[in-house]
Amino acid sequence: MVNKFLAGRLKKSKGKSFKGSSSKGNSKTVKSNNNDNVVVNAADLKWKPVEIPDTLDDFEGFYGLEEIDGVGVKIVGGQVQFVAHDDTKINGNEDNLDSKDKIEIDEDAPENDLVEFKNMDDMKDGELTDNSQSESEAEAESEAESEEEEEKTGDDEGEDGAEKVDNEVLKTNVFNTDIDLEDITPSDLPEWTEKVGELSFTTLHGLTKLGFNKPTLIQEEAIPMALKGEDIMGKASTGSGKTLAYGIPIIEKLMKSKSNTAPIGLIFTPTRELAKQVTDHLRKIASLIVDKSPHAILSLTGGLSIQKQERLLKYEGSGRIVVATPGRFLELIEKDKTLVERFSQISTLVLDEADRLLQDGHFDEFENILKYLGRESKNRKHNWQTMIFSATFATDLFDKLSHASWKNMKTPSKNENEMEIVLKHLMTKIHFKSKPILIDANPEDKVSSQIKESLIECAATERDLFCYYFVSMYPGKTLIFCNAIDSVKKLTAYLNNLNISCFQIHSSMTQKNRLRNLERYQQQSEKNKILGKPTVLVGSDVAARGLDIPGIQHVIHYHLPRTADVYIHRSGRTARANNEGVSVMICSPEEAMGPLRKLRKTLANKSGKDIIMGKKKWQKTVTMLPIDDTILSQLKERSRLASELADHDLASSSLQKDDTWMKKAAEDLGVDIDSDDEIKDTFLAKNINKKRNKTLGKDQKKVLVAQLNDLLKRPLRKDMRQRYLTGGLVNLADSLVKKRGHDHIIGHEKTDALETLKNKKRK
């Protein structure tokens, strides 16, 4: 037995494994005298493959090494025994420890039954052959049995008929460090290959994994041209798949590249959140590449450690596809001139949400980047492909809605090509290797046809109330946009006081806090979806462009946006990927007089469908959202109390910060500061007095909190007749017993904002 085990071990070491081996027919599990321990043969243990790091190259010729823990080794009478301390270490013996294969140890067995161990050098000629005949037969039987098991379990990938023994020895996951065969399924996407062309297995695998079974219109038109190396200027509505329209051609170039380090694509986005989103999207599509080279696709944005980004760029094979914001990328290449030489060799340059380049003040950093890279590429006589994508390419969209009169605006001309005008403007700033191909996936509609627009008219001081009404009446995932950061903070505190899950995101927050709030918003929305409660994200226009937050049902414009392009991008956060959504404008009388009319005329369909029989239909293209006055009246007192508490919290926090800042500044300067000095400054005095007037005393705050909590405990009712549940037009008792109707408003039917607007249009 000892000789057999050692010979088997020697053979396996020469072959590919670390453990000992014996035939399955003769390997027997043995129950020891100790009830807690089981003596087993080496072949019956659950050996685990040893992962070989890439840094160790060929690991001195060793392959197929296996290990096991929780198993002891004993030498009894010169015989090696493996002792398993628990049953889980034994193959298939967890529930069959008392089977007929187990025998009791006979410690008094005659020593003649044991095979004497001899050194290989001491053996006579022919002795090894004679002694190993039975062993060879047993091993042959073992290999046959194991091959049958492989056929049953389906683990026969890579098996070759001529080398069955070698493949049996190498049945560890030695080569799985590069690719996991179990995760790869055959990709059959006929619509992609027919409409777009031949794509690599990596791309098809990523599309299959994400469930993208067919290309969108912009992808269908842009990808074939991009694969040919043409410069492209693409326009498509929000949520139409523009990221993959330029992402897939870049990944295809990466797959065809002969170099393992040369940069392929450089993608610029206007916001950090959009850069992270694009990076995550590309990493999912190219998951097979990322598994092998984790840093091949990198995001370089501000708000995060620049030292870490510099370190990542130094890894071999890193940064082959870079998604960046212009500010951070410019900072990196100015610090390290070798990066200029490196990224001047890119094959493709992409500008996502490129309409921002038309606005003054947004192009300076990007223009400097183009100068650095362009100068170096010119020396190398190298030209890159340029692709520009956005949802809006019209110069009139960037005019301030509050400035010019809507009456002086020109009606859009049918013969005037907006993209041609924009292209002439861009060609003065960006160097194209040839005239770009213009692709317009939605030439008529500026706002996606999947978005149902609506309007709420109210006083300027009632915006909070109508936001509360909307999220109470139509629970779901809602995104509210404000023009000012102070409004974002106030509305967030206001809704939280009303026990509504609310999160905020704005430019004053650090990048980590923004991303953390987005994650928390997603997690909370999943919980509230089950409970039928609303989840709200309040943001400034930093969240308006490109962010793909799954499942946004409603977008509310707390303030009318300053420009029409911002309205288009805000509304585009809903109705993504062929879904429908609702966009609601809360408009004061002052806004309705000029900015609203100008917005509607700017967004008018240039095909002429909005002008019927001389009437300007564009003035009445927005549906008024129905308001239930009985519900609204019950919310007014709650809204007032929550608003006062929110004002108090913000004013107190602001006063405390101001006081801390003044004291710290005085301490740094070594100056004594007196409260009377603050009053001498007229501006500071007015600001401080304004904040102090909004603060409450401790007792006063407690009273307001108690009153608000008392009101929040009372359920909202559609019918205010509370004496008899069965009275009135609605049988409240029946609705309560059968659990029908609205989750939080007794007597009200379960409503959906999208269906409400659709039904109103039909009427």
From Swiss-Prot:
Disordered: annotated segments: 1-35, 87-169
Annotated ATP binding lies at 236-243
Record's keyword terms, sorted: ATP-binding, Helicase, Hydrolase, Nucleotide-binding, Nucleus, Ribosome biogenesis, RNA-binding, rRNA processing
Q: What is the E.C. number?
A: 3.6.4.13
Q: Kindly name one Pfam family recorded for this protein.
A: DEAD
Give residue spans, biased composition: Basic and acidic residues: 115-127
Give the superkingdom in one word.
Eukaryota
Q: Which ranges belong to the motif DEAD box?
A: 352-355
Q: What is its subcellular localisation? A: Nucleus, Nucleolus
| GO biological process terms held by the UniProt record | maturation of 5.8S rRNA from tricistronic rRNA transcript (SSU-rRNA, 5.8S rRNA, LSU-rRNA); maturation of LSU-rRNA from tricistronic rRNA transcript (SSU-rRNA, 5.8S rRNA, LSU-rRNA)
A cellular-component GO term for this protein: nucleolus
Q: What is known of its domains?
A: The Q motif is unique to and characteristic of the DEAD box family of RNA helicases and controls ATP binding and hydrolysis.
What name does UniProt use for this protein? ATP-dependent RNA helicase MAK5
Q: What is the lineage of its organism?
A: Eukaryota, Fungi, Dikarya, Ascomycota, Saccharomycotina
